[in-house]
Each structure stands twice: as C-alpha cells, then as structure tokens.
Amino acid sequence: MTTILKHLPVGQRIGIAFSGGLDTSAALLWMRQKGAVPYAYTANLGQPDEDDYEEIPRRAMEYGAENARLIDCRKQLVAEGIAAIQCGAFHNTTAGVTYFNTTPLGRAVTGTMLVAAMKEDGVNIWGDGSTYKGNDIERFYRYGLLTNAELKIYKPWLDTDFIDELGGRQEMSEFMSQAGFGYKMSAEKAYSTDSNILGATHEAKDLEFLNSSVKIVNPIMGVKFWDENVKVPAEEVTIRFERGHPVALNGKTFADDVELMLEANRIGGRHGLGMSDQIENRIIEAKSRGIYEAPGMALLHIAYERLVTGIHNEDTIEQYHANGRQLGRFLYQGRWFDSQALMLRDASQRWIASAITGEVTLELRRGNDYSIMNTVSDNLTYKPERLTMEKGDSVFSPDDRIGQLTMRNLDITDTREKLFNYVETGLLSSSASTGLPQVGQLQDKTEK
C-alpha cells in the first residue's frame, strides 16, 4: 500500500505541521471545509523571527483544527546541534566558510517529535508545507516513517485539487478573507527565510540569481557587517568545553543548553559571525543556492576545533574531518538517525569529544573575521618545549634527527627511478616551464 496520498482523505484525521503562516493556514481551513479532520502541531524551534508561539495554536483552532498543540523542540534541537559540532558534521563549505546544516538539524527534530505527538493523538496521516523540488519532502518522509511505521503522507501542495483552487498566495489570501478571517499577505520579500534556534536559511526568489549578493539580505540573527555604517566593535569571548560539551561563555556557566545557545547567538550575532553564501547539491543532485546565518554554532565550532587540533594527533584529526564530512551528508539527506550515521557519531563523540576539555578565547571583529587569542587545556599535546628554537634540554638530539631522516626517506631512490621512468614513457617533460624536478637532465648527468 502506498504511503503517499494524492488526494484529501475525507473524514480522516490529518496532522498538519502548522506554522501560522498563510500557506498552512489556508491549507488547514481548506481541509476542514472539504471534510477532513485536521489536527495542528506547531514546533517551537526557538525561531528568532517568531514573537508569540502561544498565539499560533489559537489561530489553528479558529481555522478549524480539531485540536492544536505546541511542541517545545528547543532542548532536543540544541542537543542535536551540539552533537553535530562534536562530530564536525558539516560538508558544505566554500573557501573554508561553513554551512552548519541548521535546517537539516531542524527537520530531524521536527520530523520525529511532531509525528510522535500525532501518534499519541491517534493521528496517522501527516501533511506539511514542503514542495516536491526541495530537500524537506524527503527528510520529513524519512523521519516521519522512522517514527511511525503506520504513517501516511498527505501534502496539499501535491494535491491537484488544492493547487487548482488555491495554487498561489493571492488565491490563498482571498480564500481566507472570504471565510471571514481577513488574512492579509505579508509584504513580499526578495527571498524566503526559514529559521530555528541554531540558524537561519535565506533562499529562493532573487537569491536564485548569483548576481544577487548577501547585501540584499536583512539578517535576523546578526548584523549587516558588510555595511560600513554599522558599527561593530571588536569583542573578546571565552568559550569553555568539558568533555566535548560547551558549558560556559565568558566565565558564566550554563546549566541549560538552550540558554547557552541563545547567549552564543547573541555574542556571535553582534558581529555577523557564521554567515555564509553556499552553492550546494540538493538530495536530487540539482544545485541550489542559500545564504545562511548561524552565529552561535559558528562560535562554538571555532572553539571546539581549536581544542581538537591542540589535543588530538594528526591521524585522529584527519579521520574526524573525513567522518564529519560523510556524516554531514547523511544529515543533509535526512539520515541523521540511520545506523551508518549513528556509527560515525558514536566514534567521534566517544573518542574525540570526550577528550575536549579546555577554554578558547577569541577576538571577534566583523563577519567571519576573528583571531584566536588563547587556548588553555590540561589535555593539550602541544608542547612548545619539544620544538623550541632556544638552547636547552631537548627531548631529541641532532643524531636522532639524522637517523630519522635516513629511515623515513629510504624511498627517495625509488621515487627518483619512477620519475626517470615517467620521462622515458613521455608522461613527464623536462621542459623548463614545469615545476617538477628536471629529472631528465638529472638522469643524463647520472649516466655520465
């Protein structure tokens, strides 16, 4: 039996992820008028652009919801965000500037917690506002069915009847007004925004054109650091981790991770830290473009990775980055709770994060411009006395290094012979324009 319902299941309970915006408001009212029994579920994700969460379920009841619930997802979302930092679960970067997968993290939490709440109410059909071209339709599909094996999916935006009647925002606004709700469309922005406590995503409309830069975006978690008229004074901040977990900012310890993330957002946001412009590959392998904000995630990530590089050895760090990139892809694809992702998460949290205890002090300036001012940890394997250029007792001698050079580089002869072979077969040229060793000339001299 198919899990996707193409038309409205009349007379049945349908859970809708209700944001209170025009789209979900019109969808809820339309479903009720057509004979379905809608239940509204609103996720409190700590969205920085949402002022009154309690009002959203009340509006849902006015529009015809059989019941409306507000589900506080902030604690779980911050926990997953910290886990992503511990694992470096980020795969989209441009010139070293990172997208912190804040929307995929939000979908992982929303998709599981809302469907779990629906299941408690005996609601086994789920609808949301994701479209067929995006990533979210697949993320919600996976997380929903992971949480409730009996779940069926109904999306108004895949229903031709709904699209024919209410296919655009103008039609939806008129529909709400005719029903007596006087819903007015908000002023159209040049892009769309989706946000949660971890970050904000700005995309679509004008941002689909690559000649529209970050300068058209009005940040909701930070400042327009690119505007010279915006004053952004430099600021020092100290971040403390204990066993991989952020616990303090500027000497203030937080027992509540949500409050710590909010403060990290405030600190990083004052500088526009963590804002990035990315061209990425969607799940369906088509490229999209987004401008992202994540001031708190960026702040914690910088401090965490500084401690990682000072505490762990080279091979461990290399594996951390490789696993993190793969895990970031799983997260992006809606597979954050799949076994292959859990395996990588466990490895990083068990063997890497557990050793990360210490403090990092940063000086934040404008945007992603910062300096590391100090790094302190009892677990540091950085020992300056081992490599000091000053005279004194040393842990190894010149003779030790001579032996190391000999043993570590026994393959030089083998490498030289391979280069000679490459020249003979025409793979390498002895042209003066190449940066490769002039092995052809060297071979001639050797033979003479």
Swiss-Prot record:
<dbReference type="GO" id="GO:0000050">
    <property type="term" value="P:urea cycle"/>
</dbReference>
<comment type="subunit">
    <text>Homotetramer.</text>
</comment>
<dbReference type="GO" id="GO:0000053">
    <property type="term" value="P:argininosuccinate metabolic process"/>
</dbReference>
<dbReference type="GO" id="GO:0004055">
    <property type="term" value="F:argininosuccinate synthase activity"/>
</dbReference>
<keyword id="KW-0963">Cytoplasm</keyword>
<keyword id="KW-0028">Amino-acid biosynthesis</keyword>
<feature type="binding site">
    <location>
        <position position="129"/>
    </location>
    <ligand>
        <name>ATP</name>
    </ligand>
</feature>
<feature type="binding site">
    <location>
        <position position="135"/>
    </location>
    <ligand>
        <name>L-aspartate</name>
    </ligand>
</feature>
<dbReference type="GO" id="GO:0005737">
    <property type="term" value="C:cytoplasm"/>
</dbReference>
<feature type="binding site">
    <location>
        <position position="135"/>
    </location>
    <ligand>
        <name>L-citrulline</name>
    </ligand>
</feature>
<feature type="binding site">
    <location>
        <position position="136"/>
    </location>
    <ligand>
        <name>ATP</name>
    </ligand>
</feature>
<feature type="binding site">
    <location>
        <position position="131"/>
    </location>
    <ligand>
        <name>ATP</name>
    </ligand>
</feature>
<feature type="binding site">
    <location>
        <position position="192"/>
    </location>
    <ligand>
        <name>L-citrulline</name>
    </ligand>
</feature>
<feature type="binding site">
    <location>
        <position position="139"/>
    </location>
    <ligand>
        <name>L-citrulline</name>
    </ligand>
</feature>
<dbReference type="GO" id="GO:0006526">
    <property type="term" value="P:L-arginine biosynthetic process"/>
</dbReference>
<dbReference type="InterPro" id="IPR023437">
    <property type="entry name" value="Arg_succ_synth_type2_subfam"/>
</dbReference>
<dbReference type="InterPro" id="IPR023434">
    <property type="entry name" value="Arginosuc_synth_type_1_subfam"/>
</dbReference>
<feature type="binding site">
    <location>
        <position position="203"/>
    </location>
    <ligand>
        <name>L-citrulline</name>
    </ligand>
</feature>
<keyword id="KW-0055">Arginine biosynthesis</keyword>
<dbReference type="InterPro" id="IPR024073">
    <property type="entry name" value="AS_multimer_C_tail"/>
</dbReference>
<feature type="binding site">
    <location>
        <position position="99"/>
    </location>
    <ligand>
        <name>L-citrulline</name>
    </ligand>
</feature>
<dbReference type="GO" id="GO:0005524">
    <property type="term" value="F:ATP binding"/>
</dbReference>
<dbReference type="Pfam" id="PF00764">
    <property type="entry name" value="Arginosuc_synth"/>
</dbReference>
<dbReference type="InterPro" id="IPR024074">
    <property type="entry name" value="AS_cat/multimer_dom_body"/>
</dbReference>
<protein>
    <recommendedName>
        <fullName>Argininosuccinate synthase</fullName>
        <ecNumber>6.3.4.5</ecNumber>
    </recommendedName>
</protein>
<comment type="pathway">
    <text>Amino-acid biosynthesis; L-arginine biosynthesis; L-arginine from L-ornithine and carbamoyl phosphate: step 2/3.</text>
</comment>
<keyword id="KW-0436">Ligase</keyword>
<feature type="binding site">
    <location>
        <position position="43"/>
    </location>
    <ligand>
        <name>ATP</name>
    </ligand>
</feature>
<feature type="binding site">
    <location>
        <position position="131"/>
    </location>
    <ligand>
        <name>L-aspartate</name>
    </ligand>
</feature>
<feature type="binding site">
    <location>
        <position position="201"/>
    </location>
    <ligand>
        <name>L-citrulline</name>
    </ligand>
</feature>
<dbReference type="InterPro" id="IPR048268">
    <property type="entry name" value="Arginosuc_syn_C"/>
</dbReference>
<feature type="binding site">
    <location>
        <position position="280"/>
    </location>
    <ligand>
        <name>L-citrulline</name>
    </ligand>
</feature>
<keyword id="KW-0547">Nucleotide-binding</keyword>
<dbReference type="InterPro" id="IPR001518">
    <property type="entry name" value="Arginosuc_synth"/>
</dbReference>
<dbReference type="InterPro" id="IPR018223">
    <property type="entry name" value="Arginosuc_synth_CS"/>
</dbReference>
<dbReference type="Pfam" id="PF20979">
    <property type="entry name" value="Arginosuc_syn_C"/>
</dbReference>
<keyword id="KW-0067">ATP-binding</keyword>
<comment type="similarity">
    <text>Belongs to the argininosuccinate synthase family. Type 2 subfamily.</text>
</comment>
<dbReference type="InterPro" id="IPR014729">
    <property type="entry name" value="Rossmann-like_a/b/a_fold"/>
</dbReference>
<dbReference type="GO" id="GO:0042803">
    <property type="term" value="F:protein homodimerization activity"/>
</dbReference>
<feature type="binding site">
    <location>
        <begin position="17"/>
        <end position="25"/>
    </location>
    <ligand>
        <name>ATP</name>
    </ligand>
</feature>
<feature type="binding site">
    <location>
        <position position="194"/>
    </location>
    <ligand>
        <name>ATP</name>
    </ligand>
</feature>
